[in-house]
Amino acid sequence: MCRHVAELDRLTELPISADLENGYGARPEDAAQAIRRAAEAGAVGGSIEDWDPEHGLYDREQAVERVHAAAEAANGLDFPFALTARAENHIRGNSHLEDTIERLQAFQAVGADVLYAPGLRNVAEIKAVCDAVSNPVKCRT
């Protein structure tokens, strides 16, 4: 990932936000390290998701700890870095909207700049998420 970010950074003046998947590990330190490495490669933003390809969704507490560590890493940089925290419920087979909202609220509380809930199914779900948080929301239906 870092090699691709560095290549893009070399080729364009546009700001780069990297999809950092789950931070390339389950520990909060892994999420923090992914932020630092992406920033070193030239990214000014990145996303961390609450899903692991081997084990599925992280429990909420672990997911929040990981986003908090990523936010602390982003805040420790010497330039602004936009952290997007992803609640993967809806695209991973758990369409429980209340849990998605609670995760996004917790991610916001620990420092995520942007909240992302891919897979919301309709305008009513998108509105419910947007009404429940104050930070910018990204969504994909």
Language-model features: locations:
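Alpha/beta enzyme core
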Residues: 1-139
